Amino acid sequence: MAKPLTDGERRKQISVRGLAGLGDVAEVRKSFNRHLHFTLVKDRNVATRRDYYLALAHTVRDHLVGRWIRTQQRYYERDPKRIYYLSLEFYMGRTLQNTMVNLGLQNACDEAIYQLGLDLEELEEIEEDAGLGNGGLGRLAACFLDSMATLGLAAYGYGIRYEFGIFNQKIVNGWQVEEADDWLRYGNPWEKARPEYMLPVHFYGRVEHSPEGVRWLDTQVVLAMPYDTPVPGYKNDTVNTMRLWSAKAPNDFKLHDFNVGGYIEAVLDRNLAENISRVLYPNDNFFEGKELRLKQEYFVVAATLQDIIRRFKSSKFGCRDPVRTSFETFPDKVAIQLNDTHPALAIPELMRILVDVEKVDWDKAWEITKKTCAYTNHTVLPEALERWPVSMFEKLLPRHLDIIYAINQRHLDHVAALFPGDVDRLRRMSVIEEGDCKRINMAHLCVIGSHAVNGVARIHSEIVRQSVFKDFYELEPEKFQNKTNGITPRRWLLLCNPGLAETIVERIGEGFLTDLSQLKKLLPLVGDEALIRDVAQVKQENKVKFSAFLEKQYGVKVNPSSMFDVHVKRIHEYKRQLLNCLHVVTLYNRIKKDPTQAFVPRTVMIGGKAAPGYHMAKKIIKLVTSIGNIVNHDPIVGDRLKVIFLENYRVSLAEKVIPAADLSQQISTAGTEASGTGNMKFMLNGALTIGTMDGANVEMAEEAGAENLFIFGLRVEDVEALDRKGYNAHEYYDRLPELRQAVDQINGGFFSPREPDCFKDVVNMLLNHDRFKVFADYEAYVACQARVDQLYRNPKEWTKKVIRNIACSGKFSSDRTITEYAHDIWGAEPPALQTPPPSLPRD
């Protein structure tokens, strides 16, 4: 009888190293047909378009798994410091094309699919966006995952596998209507369920103090089931993991609560536990304070920390037994980055595990926690800051409330010792806010419990230091940093704008795709006639393509020779879509007043979602669609001005509209947009920016030269001065006839003849309580737009500025951002050693 295999031999038998890569066209075809038959159980007679998409997805996924396993093996062998990026949002978009691009498979797949009589682009369109985010925060997390994999960092994204992502937006009679985003309806070929790593998460219960320590008892348990999605780096054979948790009820859930007859009710009530991962809260920059949301925040943190500690304790290859019992080295092996305050409970939860479970003494546990955690602040808007009622914690997380009180007491003792007698400072710096309803300030908890706190653009980090966390900065100035946001050039150039990428590669090679600073090599070519021609031609092709898409999707005809003026982002008062509306109405009035004048034709596109409960944002959408209805059907205006609301703006739509844009609108009130990343995407794709000195616009102007952007409006210090003086919108309304005309038309029902009073509340807000000072910037904005028109009339000079902007956008790669995080915050340098491809032997 054959001798039984050793563990090592058995592992070699199922190793992926022996599998040949499927890079060539014939292999892709073969694999595609195999999946169509054996995975999907279809033949070409009955297969649907979705079957073809799934067959291709599985074919491409086959290329990932070897690298994925190999990457994880290598991490277990080398035991590098792990980076854990905790976020309640990951706005990933589609996966198929990104995976083909990062693995260098796109050409082979394109040819194979063509030979099979199918169209690759058509199949790509079938994939649902993974819309597990609201906007910038979630998309940043997705770009960061791409960069961490491309840099070879041992990084993991941890979040929630929402059954329903950000709602689908329909426009009905000009109003936003929300539809559920059932993105998992047809299954998700990119994820792998990992039931063997399912973990319990506790809620409610009571706290018992005894000589042996503290116990949290009589809790309700919900299980967290992990689903893993591969995150491939760009052509480096590294594949990292995004692990998303899904809530499952335990098998005995509620059964003991019922008498003999209650079995069916108990099974039906399992839904209550599983609701935790049901839906993404659709609020952007707004705190609502719902108990289910707090449950989501604790759920992801509790499951993730158990997973992190399991991996820390058994972090050598092939070993599931605990090998580390001491937590001394925990901060040397683990970095936890908190993406905003949503995962703030990681701080008290790590303390609970260390003190209650692992029996580490408090001071040591606190030192470990602080060295491990770091916090990124994403907003300065007061309504966005998370402040949870103490009463909710008392009920839901009683042990964590105790721990937060203890953290706060020690913190305040420290402050009192440094600033004796300064009672107001203690009040300002406390984690607990006193008042009618006692609240926990999660941002304060994050600052106290982290070794590093960063803002996301230089101007924002300055506001964080001087205003939002001024007292904390005075206490620990060395803790505060800036890390200007970035975007991945793989998705936001190579994937979405292959024509422009190719034009650049022809001039400077392809090194810029992993070192975006190399775009500087284009600077000497700014005046090169051939480059000017090629860049302009690519832009025109993108505009023609997007025009065809608009006609097909929305039945809207636009003139691709007009200026594409694009304003796409979440609908929010601070982002000032209303300022754009006032300019559009002003242009309309000018055309009507003198139709014989030479106007630069414009297609104004505005897109974005409004939070379902945000009345003013929904009114803004209605206003845009109403203005469009009048302007677009006015025969005197004709082709010179069109206003289009881009329905259901999402990652996959951004990938189409951004490469086609001529003008990028980034017009938030100075001091309100933390960074913005859409601004960077437009810059990289050859649009010029009209914007205020806010967020990353400031650094874009610094990189490219302010004369190569259209900068207008109040600066932060002007806004502050206006606040001190008192902002009076009526001054501008009375002084500026064009503004007054536009406002009166909106107020009087000119754009809403069937509902003349529709926009009275909008105008009332603008005149009497506009926090974001739309009228104060109107005059400068309209004048700046005239400069835009003037330059657009000179295509060559316009394109020169475009090339200069592209050449100066290198700073805004998320690779640069992540390299800075790794060096300055995580203490984990990107490795020089790449992961060998799965077909090479391990060293």
From Swiss-Prot:
Iron-sulfur found in the keyword field: no
Residue numbers carrying N-acetylalanine: 2
List of residues that carry Phosphoserine: 15
Site feature (May be involved in allosteric control) residues: 156
Swiss-Prot/TrEMBL site (Involved in the association of subunits) positions: 109, 143
Region (Pyridoxal 5'-phosphate): 677-678
Post-translational modification summary for this protein: Phosphorylation of Ser-15 converts phosphorylase B (unphosphorylated) to phosphorylase A.
Cited Pfam families: Phosphorylase
Annotated positions binding AMP: 43, 197, 310
Class of this enzyme: transferase
InterPro entries cross-referenced by the UniProt entry: Glycg_phsphrylas, Glyco_trans_35, Pyridoxal_P_attach_site
GO terms (BP aspect): glycogen catabolic process
GO MF annotations, alphabetized: glycogen phosphorylase activity; pyridoxal phosphate binding
Record CDD domains: GT35_Glycogen_Phosphorylase
Record-listed E.C. numbers: 2.4.1.1
Catalytic activity: [(1->4)-alpha-D-glucosyl](n) + phosphate = [(1->4)-alpha-D-glucosyl](n-1) + alpha-D-glucose 1-phosphate
Annotated NCBIfam families: P_ylase
UniProt protein name: Glycogen phosphorylase, brain form
Species per Swiss-Prot/TrEMBL record: Bos taurus
